């Protein structure tokens, strides 16, 4: 059975770094969600305009399809995207199961305190997501609770390496349980 692992959370939690590391540790493909945003979404975010639900649906569908397709290489793939709301996570699961009915979807949601993320984003250069938009992400954020296949991981002041190890441990437990 294939598994699609989605690493999410608000901008600045390190999901791209953690997701890429996880894919290396699991020896499976990595799909960076930011690479699949249409230019219209990038333009909005670059100008400090938060995305709406309508801006996200096509992007989430395309990203999920790419991730599901990538599982055919090794039986697993890691995808990163914010998946801030329950309805986004449900949509990802729906699309994944439509594409591959027996796929397992594991969602690893990284979250942190606003001030920690704001400080980290203030030091980040060259990314289209500006720290001025962090407030809108926190307004939208629904941390998973008792949600099938979803695990919330609080980052705190942990290093990216420590978070990566925690994420890998959860992923391996779930992957072992599916075999």
Where are the model-predicted features located?
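Hydrophobic anchor at the beta1->P-loop junction of P-loop NTPases
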Residues: 7
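The conserved Walker
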Residues: 11
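Conserved glycine(s) of the Walker
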Residues: 14
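Conserved substrate/cofactor phosphate-moiety recognition/catalytic segment
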Residues: 17-68
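Conserved nucleotide-binding/hydrolysis micro-motifs of P-loop NTPases
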Residues: 37, 83-85, 111-116, 159
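A glycine- and Lys/Arg-enriched "phosphate-lid" helix/loop adjacent to the NTP-binding pocket
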Residues: 44, 49, 96-144
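Glycine-rich phosphate-binding loop used to anchor ATP phosphates in small-molecule kinases
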Residues: 54-101
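Small-molecule kinase domains that catalyze NTP-dependent phosphoryl transfer to phosphate-bearing small molecules
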Residues: 123-168, 174, 178
